[in-house]
Amino acid sequence: IGGNAYTVINNVTALQAMSSGLSGKYALGSDIDAGATSTWNSGAGFAPVGTYVYLNPAASFTGAFDGLGHTISYLYINRPSTNYVGLFGGTSGSAIIRNVGLVYGNITGNSSSMISSVGGLVGYNEGGISNSYSTGMVTGYFSVGGLVGENHGTIENSYSGGTVIGTIGTGDVVGGLVGINEVAGSISNSYSTSTVNGTDYVGGLVGMNFGTITTNSYSTGDVTGAYAVGGLVGDNYASIINSFSTGTVTSSGGYVGGLVGKNELAGTISNSYSTSTVNGTDEVGGLVGINYGAITANSFSAGVVTGTGYDVGGLAGYNDGIISNSYN
C-alpha cells in the first residue's frame, strides 16, 4: 500500500496479534467476525491493542492500520476495571487508522475511573483517523465516545452509531462520536447517529470540546443527561463551525441546549444550527443553554424548547456573552 509492505490480517487471532507489534503496518484482507472474543480471557474478551502511558509513546500503537473498506463485527471487550479501552487502547501521534468499520461491537471500559477513556475504535487517540466508523454499544465512566474516548489527534470523514452510555448515575463527559476532544483535537466532516446517555457534560457528537469541530460535522441521535447537555456538544470551550444537530435533547437539570449545553467564555459557535427538540429544567435554549462565549455568523435554532424552571429561550436560555447575526 503506497509502496509500503503491510501485514495482511484475515482473522481475529491475527487481529489480536497486533499487540505484539505496535509499530507495524497492518491491513485487513477480508471482513472479520470477532464474535469468538466473547469467550476470550475468562469473559474479558479482546485485549485492546496498545494503551496510553504518560511520556511513553512506545506503549501505544504507533503504526498504521488500513481496513481497506472491510469490517470487524461483534468485537467484545468487557474490562470494567481497565482504562484506555477500544479496539486500540491508545494510539500515538504517528499512528494512522483508516478505512475500517467496527460493527455490532460491545465495548465496556472502566466503570469508576476519572481517566477511563473508552471508545469503540480507540480509547485514547493522538493519531489520525479517517474514513472509519463504529456501531454497537460503548460503555464507560468518564470520557466515553462511540468512536473515540479521548481525542488529541485528527478525526475526519468518520462516524458512529448505536448506543453510548456513561455509567448510569455517574458517567460524565460522554459523546456520540468522542467523549472529550482536547486542545489539539480536530473533528471534521464527521457525524454521529448514536443514542447517548450520561450524567454531566453529555453531547450528541462530543461530550466536552477544547479543540475544533468543523466542516459539516453533525449529530442526529437523541441525547439524555443531567447537567450541560447538548445536541452536538455538552460543554464547549473552543470552536464549533459549520455544524448542526437534529436529535431530541433531554436534561433532568440545567444548562441544556439544542446544539450546546454550556458555551464557555472561550467558546465560539458560527454558521451552525439546531432543529432539536429540547427539554430541560433551567437554562434551556434552542441553540445554547447558557452562553458565556460567542454565537455568530448566521447560527440559528428552529426546534421546540420546553423548560420547567427559569431562563428558557428560543436561541439561548441565559446569555452573558455575545450573540450576533443569529436567530431563532
Which functions belong to the PLM regions below?
Residues 1-328:
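Surface-exposed repetitive/solenoidal architectures
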